[in-house]
A protein has these predicted regions:
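ATP-dependent helicase/translocase motor core
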Residues: 1-275
Length: 275
């Protein structure tokens, strides 16, 4: 289909130009620790197998129970808390590490922060794009949804990309799909770790945050002067999903603003603020 063609183009760009790995999950995914993604069920939105490997790689001095504690904290869903509350806490964990504690050999309590992403050495992280990922809601009636493209770093779903056929208005991706997915009764838990959202039809592309209204979804204009003739979608992929750039955005260019009425707003920098 047209939508799949756009998906394929995006995925190939991530793989061939930006060095991501990719998996096509739809109807092909197997479950269990040795399955395609290591998910136990369609409700899992963190790839624990990848996260566990990253925690071990980035925290060689932490004992296994401390790493397990970090996984528990990064995958916990608290039904009393909102999407934004989860997202803010997890963003802090991703940037500065997950607080863990354990008892050492002599019974003393030790404290540390488990690093989840290596912001200094990009090659120390695992970048995986998954197409057509089936996700089931954690609240009754457990709706089933299918995500076009989810970009994971060390098993955490940091970027969610909704794709439309090239002749469709990209606003449809927001109105018809993202708005539904972000609802607590749908698959909001898939966005607890999200850095930003992207909607595109393969030509036009815009990005925003989990709290953005459509009018606050913006284009990633250009990465440099030589980009003048390129389509928006390509400029956005290169500008936001090149590995170094994505980690830079996550570490330094996302903030939560409580200055206005109506609750916390999550803000992702515009490209002129980053370049």
């Amino acid at each position: 289909s047209e939508d799949r063609l756009v998906q394929q183009t995006f995925t190939e760009h991530l793989e061939n130009m930006l060095g991501w790995e990719s998996v096509y999950a739809y109807n092909a995914e197997t479950f269990g620790p040795d399955g395609t993604l290591g998910r136990m069920s369609e409700r899992d939105v963190v790839l624990v197998r990848d996260l566990s490997a990253a925690l071990e790689r980035l925290n060689p001095d932490l004992p296994a129970p401390a790493r397990e504690q970090a996984i528990d904290k990064l995958t916990r869903i608290d039904f009393a808390r909102s999407l934004v509350q989860h997202n803010r806490e997890f963003h802090g964990f991703i940037r500065t590490g997950v607080p863990v504690e354990w008892r050492d050999a002599v019974g003393e309590t030790r404290y540390a922060r488990a690093q989840v992403i290596d912001f200094r050495n990009v090659a120390n992280n695992h970048f995986l794009a998954v197409r057509e990922l089936k996700i089931q809601g954690v609240r009754v009636p457990h709706y089933n949804r299918r995500a076009d493209l989810v970009c994971f770093v060390n098993g955490l779903p940091l970027v969610f990309i909704e794709l439309k056929a090239v002749y469709r208005n990209i606003r449809a991706g927001f109105d018809d799909n993202l708005t539904d997915y972000l609802s607590e009764h749908s698959i909001a838990h898939a966005f607890h770790h999200n850095a930003f959202l992207v909607v595109s039809n393969g030509d036009q592309a815009r990005y925003g945050s989990i709290t953005s209204k459509w009018e606050h979804f913006v284009e990633w204009k250009r990465n440099s002067e030589k980009d003048k003739g390129r389509v928006d979608a390509e400029a956005l992929l290169d500008g936001m999903l090149a590995k170094e750039r994505l980690l830079d955005l996550v570490e330094s260019f996302i903030l939560f603003d409580e200055s206005r009425a109506g609750g916390t707003r999550k803000i992702v920098a515009r490209n002129h603020q980053v370049l």
